């Protein structure tokens, strides 16, 4: 067939992209991936996402599509929905959102009108952009009111949150965060929502895998709506989901997702979600999640013992947040040095941070990805020691190129290679 290149390997058809894929595979497998929103998916998830379902366009929902030829993708989506509901014990689920951010926006579209009041955690306290931050559409369409953590403990103060809610009478209250390492009292949030007649949204994007593994409180039974990403601790493909136990809310959500904000669903991603949900129901996944908690707590303990200010004093999740202000360092500088040394994390705002978002006063470290690669407590204790070496050396004015090179050599002894190189390019 003239011009058809469907059977040509990417290394032949597009050497530039093939080189990029190979380089990224090498990067992932020669450094420690400590970004809390990242993980390593299984070969099965990769295979589903890179499957022939990429070729199929499907608008609507199973049994009610606008295009023909959807019988098999209907099976994939139905499996994903059924497995997600079973995994979290909810009645209704939508697996079509392309991302967690879009899932949140679709909830707003379903339940709110422009100008309504939304109460969510501030960015520097650990909240997410989509919870009402000024630059985000959630902060532009709605009257966004933030709540903060306590200055003395950096923990949520449910009494203060209730006071704010009683004063501003929000239409929606959001619980959930991108850098809050402790447990969230979903029951208390629902009680506040009921007092002011608000909807309660739990965004569990970071915690969903921990919840599925029984290591973090569940919002189900309290939240009117629950959103999540499917990567991070859930260890699936990048994407979003929306869940509820309320049939009327479910109907509104369906319309908000399609045709409200999306057209065709990404069927290859939905199939990969189904695979990940099944994996998350296995006994091995519970063991994995338990190990995440052991590892992150070990990391936090080493950092705190070594003199770093660990936000909230520890962690109940996969993430550890470090406040660097007492060291006179910025998150940008420390995270950049750590990356050169082979420890990849991210700069992060800390409570009541006055630095710009692209500078920040802290870093965030996550345990999910490296736990997937088999690292255990002793390895995370070593990682903590290496982080301390970088920070202490920066404060001492040492030659960081020498220090970083030495740390990278030690990192090489910790890295466990994920053996799906045949799928890398």
UniProtKB/Swiss-Prot annotation:
Positions of post-translational N6-(pyridoxal phosphate)lysine modification: 232
Residues at which (6S)-5,6,7,8-tetrahydrofolate binds: 123, 127-129, 248
A single Pfam family, by name?
SHMT
Using the UniProt record, give the first listed, main subcellular location: cytoplasm
Quickly give the catalysed reaction: (6R)-5,10-methylene-5,6,7,8-tetrahydrofolate + glycine + H2O = (6S)-5,6,7,8-tetrahydrofolate + L-serine
- Which key words tag this protein in UniProt? Amino-acid biosynthesis, Cytoplasm, One-carbon metabolism, Pyridoxal phosphate, Transferase
Keyword match Transmembrane? no
- Protein origin, superkingdom: Bacteria
Annotated compartments: Cytoplasm
Residues the record annotates as the site (Plays an important role in substrate specificity) are 231
Its cellular-component GO annotations read:
cytosol
> Does this entry carry the keyword Amino-acid biosynthesis?
yes
What positions belong to coiled-coil segments?
Answer: none
Give, as in the UniProt entry, the pathway in which the protein acts. One-carbon metabolism; tetrahydrofolate interconversion; Amino-acid biosynthesis; glycine biosynthesis; glycine from L-serine: step 1/1
GO molecular function terms listed in the Swiss-Prot or TrEMBL record: glycine hydroxymethyltransferase activity; pyridoxal phosphate binding
Q: Which cofactor does it need?
A: pyridoxal 5'-phosphate
The protein's matches in SUPFAM superfamilies, at most eight in alphabetical order, are given as: PLP-dependent transferases (SSF53383)
Q: Give the Enzyme Commission number.
A: 2.1.2.1
Which GO BP annotation is one of this protein's?
Answer: glycine biosynthetic process from serine
Which InterPro entries did the record assign?
PyrdxlP-dep_Trfase (IPR015424), PyrdxlP-dep_Trfase_major (IPR015421), PyrdxlP-dep_Trfase_small (IPR015422), Ser_HO-MeTrfase (IPR001085), Ser_HO-MeTrfase-like (IPR049943), Ser_HO-MeTrfase_PLP_BS (IPR019798), SHMT-like_dom (IPR039429)
Oligomeric state and partners? Homodimer.
What's its job? Catalyzes the reversible interconversion of serine and glycine with tetrahydrofolate (THF) serving as the one-carbon carrier. This reaction serves as the major source of one-carbon groups required for the biosynthesis of purines, thymidylate, methionine, and other important biomolecules. Also exhibits THF-independent aldolase activity toward beta-hydroxyamino acids, producing glycine and aldehydes, via a retro-aldol mechanism.
Family, per the entry? Belongs to the SHMT family.
Record's protein name: Serine hydroxymethyltransferase
Its lineage opens with: Bacteria, Pseudomonadati, Pseudomonadota, Alphaproteobacteria, Rickettsiales
């Amino acid at each position: 067939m003239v011009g058809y290149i469907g059977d040509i390997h990417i290394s032949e058809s597009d050497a530039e992209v093939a080189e990029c894929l190979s380089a990224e595979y090498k990067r992932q497998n020669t450094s420690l991936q400590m970004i809390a929103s990242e993980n390593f998916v299984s070969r099965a998830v990769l295979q589903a996402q890179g499957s022939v379902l990429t070729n199929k366009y499907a608008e609507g929902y199973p049994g009610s599509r606008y295009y023909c030829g959807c019988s098999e993708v209907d099976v994939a989506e139905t499996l994903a929905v059924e497995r997600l509901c079973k995994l979290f014990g909810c009645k209704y689920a939508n697996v079509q959102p392309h991302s967690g951010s879009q899932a949140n926006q679709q909830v707003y579209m379903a339940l709110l009108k422009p100008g309504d009041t939304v109460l969510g955690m501030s960015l520097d306290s650990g909240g997410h952009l989509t919870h009402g931050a000024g630059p985000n559409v959630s902060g532009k369409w709605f009257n966004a009111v933030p709540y903060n953590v306590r200055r003395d403990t950096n923990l949520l103060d449910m009494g203060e949150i209730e006071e704010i809610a009683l004063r501003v009478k929000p239409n929606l209250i959001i619980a959930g965060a991108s850098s809050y390492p402790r447990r969230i009292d979903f029951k208390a949030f629902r009680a506040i929502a009921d007092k002011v007649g608000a909807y309660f949204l739990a965004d569990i994007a970071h915690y969903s895998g921990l919840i599925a593994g029984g290591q973090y409180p569940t919002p189900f039974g309290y939240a009117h709506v629950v959103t999540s990403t499917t990567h991070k601790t859930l260890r699936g493909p990048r994407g979003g989901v929306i869940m509820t136990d309320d049939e009327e809310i479910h109907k509104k959500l369906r319309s908000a997702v399609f045709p409200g904000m999306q057209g065709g669903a990404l069927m290859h991603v939905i199939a990969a979600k189904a695979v990940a949900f099944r994996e998350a129901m296995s006994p091995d996944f519970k063991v994995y999640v338990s190990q995440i908690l052991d590892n992150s707590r070990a990391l936090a303990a080493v950092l705190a013992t070594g003199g770093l200010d660990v936000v909230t004093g520890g962690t109940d999740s996969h993430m550890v947040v470090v406040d660097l202000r007492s060291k006179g360092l910025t998150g940008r500088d420390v995270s950049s040095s750590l990356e050169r040394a082979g420890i990849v994390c991210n700069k992060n705002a800390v409570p009541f941070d006055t630095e710009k978002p692209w500078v920040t006063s802290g870093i965030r470290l996550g345990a999910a990805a490296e736990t997937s690669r088999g690292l255990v407590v002793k390895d995370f204790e070593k990682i903590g020691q290496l982080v301390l070496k970088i920070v202490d050396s920066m404060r001492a004015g040492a030659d960081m190129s020498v220090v970083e090179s030495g740390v990278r050599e030690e990192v090489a002894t910790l890295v466990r290679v994920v053996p799906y190189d045949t799928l890398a390019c």
